[in-house]
A protein has these predicted regions:
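Membrane-embedded multi-pass helical conduit in multi-pass membrane proteins
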Residues: 50-126
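Helix N-terminus capping/helix-initiation residues
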Residues: 10, 42-43, 96
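Short linear elements at protein peripheries
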Residues: 126-134
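Short, hydrophobic secondary-structure boundary micro-motifs
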Residues: 5-6, 38-42, 100-101, 131-132
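Generic hydrophobic/packing signal
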Residues: 1, 22-25, 29, 46-47, ...
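A loop-to-helix transmembrane entry motif
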Residues: 15, 36-54
């Protein structure tokens, strides 16, 4: 049996889904139960990737006033690439370098969404944003 998934994904819908329907509910669940269920993708490499993505973004944003911050931002990015090298290598082997580069970008975007959802929840947000039209 073969079926076609007919959902149309845009970058906006992916970001919205990753934050509102994944990151925030997972963060709420972890805070409520004080444990990370084994079914969630929360291996140490992924946790480090989210943290390093946040660090890299914060340093990059601050770099116009302190250009020396680009060096540690680059180091954080290299750390993310190293932590996920086997996945990126797989993307390259399956579909080539352009596909792998797009995969790296989307993976970084995913880590950013995870971090934003977790931060939002930890800061007391995470209410029912879906109903509010966010």
């Amino acid at each position: 049996l073969q079926v076609k998934h007919a959902k149309v994904w845009t970058l906006r819908s992916m970001i919205r889904t990753d934050i509102l329907l994944r990151a925030i509910p997972w963060a709420k669940l972890i805070l409520r139960t004080r444990t990370a269920p084994g079914t969630l993708n929360l291996r140490p490499a992924q946790r480090w990737s989210v943290a390093l993505t946040g660090i890299a973004l914060a340093l990059a944003v601050a770099s116009p006033v302190a250009p020396f911050l680009l060096l540690p931002a680059g180091a954080a990015l290299i750390g993310i690439l190293a932590l996920n090298a086997s996945f990126y290598r797989f993307l390259c082997e399956v579909r080539g370098i352009p596909f792998a580069l797009a995969g790296v970008f989307l993976h970084l975007l995913y880590f950013t969404c995870c971090g934003l959802g977790a931060a939002w929840t930890l800061l007391g947000g995470g209410g029912d944003l879906e109903r509010k039209g966010v």
